[in-house]
């Protein structure tokens, strides 16, 4: 089922009308291959799609030639390099798009090798593709795609041979909650919030959700079951990649469903050397598994920086599933859920709901609403966390208290929160707002209120 990605398809269509190279990248299973094939297929463009293996250049060239023989009756000749191959392709074919997916796999083969000249080989391949783009795309187009955010972004760095060679770049991200709704149309708005909080926005993940079953049954079947499709998906595509360095697991296990500052990670993990912790955090940032955030209005204060796992599904995995195999095998998925997930699942969802609220503001601004808001973030004051704080054009701030409830928010709770805000220092508070998925018992004057009808733009 293909939904969304209209802007990305439009950009690929514009690229096709030119000559040159496009770079497309994003995490595994985010839909890069599906997007590229959909865009090219809809326009009936002639294309050849090749996925690199984690092997040397010659092996990948030979595999690509084998594919070309099958798909476009290519020559039986052997080629020593991609440069020689594309020289031939440019002479013999016209108006093709050649897609080289997982370019980063081939780069990783050299970068991870212990041989002394391997890094030079990786740079040489980039130089080859520089020559291909400069000299051998006069008749065709090239798309380079990859899952390693770090490697693919490095291709566009000013020190890379490929700097300035791409006519465009597309960073493919997970679906927002609104796009996820298009893939899960049978869910109620409230259920969608809960499902998105647990499973996130990967199209691959969303396709495996059974919309006829409740959240508990989907978690048990997909994540707690020993053969669960999403449990295996995480192990194969994320967890196994981290196995060579247990410190990475340690950091993620500390962060889990929350936001952790550097000193909190340092104190709660077993990584006592600050230099080592810095390296491990950089590794997770490069892998695009975590992100570093700053408090709104405190962007220059590096001490206030905190770290968070980006993907909801991975958050859930580390919060509940990681290192729990023995318990799950002994208890079975149903009983494990009842004992270790059910008591805190609403709290877990409430934390993720805060992120969805921030996503709502971004979407609303793009739709022409809330035009006076320029930034949304989090703020800590006097041991209190303010979930969602919006900075306005005039430099003042609107503080939103976010609640994920099964019943409407009560007046006395709102009044208590408003009283507490009087003590906030450091930011100029112009207004307060309340966000509750279940609505409100009553509404007070001069206060902003948001509920699910607003989130799905139904009001």
Roles of regions detected by a PLM:
Residues 1-334:
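Phosphate-binding site recognition
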Residues 305-459:
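A cross-kingdom feature that marks ATP-driven nucleic-acid transaction machinery
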């Amino acid at each position: 089922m293909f939904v969304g990605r209209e802007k990305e398809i439009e950009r690929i269509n514009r690229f096709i009308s030119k000559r040159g190279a496009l770079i497309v990248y994003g995490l595994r299973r985010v839909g890069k291959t599906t997007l590229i094939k959909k865009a090219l297929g809809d326009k009936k463009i002639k294309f050849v799609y090749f996925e690199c293996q984690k092997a040397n250049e010659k092996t990948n060239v030979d595999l690509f030639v084998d594919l070309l023989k099958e798909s476009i009756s290519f020559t039986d000749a052997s080629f020593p390099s991609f440069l020689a191959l594309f020289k031939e392709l440019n002479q013999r074919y016209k108006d093709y798009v050649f897609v080289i997916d997982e370019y980063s796999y081939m780069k990783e083969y050299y970068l991870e090798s212990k041989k002394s000249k391997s890094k030079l080989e990786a740079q040489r391949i980039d130089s080859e593709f520089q020559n291909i783009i400069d000299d051998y795309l006069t008749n065709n187009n090239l798309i380079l795609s990859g899952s390693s955010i770090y490697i693919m972004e490095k291709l566009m760095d000013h020190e890379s041979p490929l700097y300035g060679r791409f006519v465009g770049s597309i960073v493919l991200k997970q679906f927002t909650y609104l796009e996820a709704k298009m893939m899960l149309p049978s869910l109620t708005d409230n259920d969608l919030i809960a499902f998105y909080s647990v499973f996130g926005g990967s199209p691959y993940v969303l396709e495996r959700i059974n919309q006829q079953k409740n959240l508990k049954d989907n978690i048990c079947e997909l994540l707690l079951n020993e053969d669960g499709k999403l449990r295996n998906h995480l192990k194969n595509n994320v967890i196994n990649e981290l196995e060579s360095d247990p410190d990475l697991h340690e950091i993620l296990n500390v962060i889990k469903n929350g936001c952790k500052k550097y000193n909190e990670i340092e104190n709660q993990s077993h990584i006592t050397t600050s230099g080592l912790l810095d390296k491990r955090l950089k590794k997770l940032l490069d892998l695009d598994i975590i992100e570093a955030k700053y408090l709104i209005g405190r962007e220059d204060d590096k001490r206030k920086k905190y770290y968070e796992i980006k993907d909801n599904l991975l958050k859930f995995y580390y919060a509940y599933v990681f290192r729990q195999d023995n318990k799950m095998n002994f208890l079975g998925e149903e009983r494990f859920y009842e004992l270790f997930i059910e008591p805190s699942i609403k709290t877990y969802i409430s934390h993720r709901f805060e992120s969805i609220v921030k996503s709502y503001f971004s979407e609303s601004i793009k739709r022409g609403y809330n035009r006076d808001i320029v930034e949304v973030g989090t703020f800590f004051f006097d041991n209190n966390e303010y979930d969602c704080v919006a900075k306005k054009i005039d430099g003042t701030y609107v503080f939103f208290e976010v609640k994920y409830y099964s019943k409407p928010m009560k007046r006395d709770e709102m009044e208590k929160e408003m009283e507490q805000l009087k003590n906030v220092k450091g930011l100029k508070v112009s207004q307060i707002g309340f966000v509750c998925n279940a609505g409100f018992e009553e509404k007070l004057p001069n206060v902003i209120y948001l509920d699910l009808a607003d989130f799905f733009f139904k009001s």
